[in-house]
Amino acid sequence: IKHVKGNGKRRLALFTDPNCQYCKKLEKEMVGLTNATIYIFVLPILPGSEEKAKAIWCSPDRLKTWEDWMLNGVEPQSEKACDTTALTKISMHTKKLRINVTPTLIFEDGVIKPGTLTLDLLEEHLTEAGQTN
């Protein structure tokens, strides 16, 4: 799921679980980010997360459905089945990257930060990562 804010100049990858409370806290912090592109990789590792991930993935507007759930608690509805092999691929790639905690952030410079960050720390890391590229 790709979320462009402002000019989208700074980039960030987010590995996140739809049932993770720390992920939801991070999402609330990220609302204030400016001029960033966030690549959201849904990684269902907690109980009940796989069905939610599929419902979000199969929705007509993934980003809206994701934000409705993560920020507002609106349960994603599974309207129809769709190809969810991307979710399987995300899971396989995270194993290769040894990502087993959500949330996990990867910045443009390759720095990996597991856990929740404040908006100030997110901005700081995004700025630093952009300067090294």
State the predicted function of each range.
Residues T104, L119-D120:
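Post-signal/leader-peptide non-cytosolic segments of secretory proteins
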Residues P114-G115, L122:
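Short active-site-adjacent structural elements
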Residues K52-M70:
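Acidic, Ser/Thr-rich peripheral helices and adjacent loops at domain boundaries
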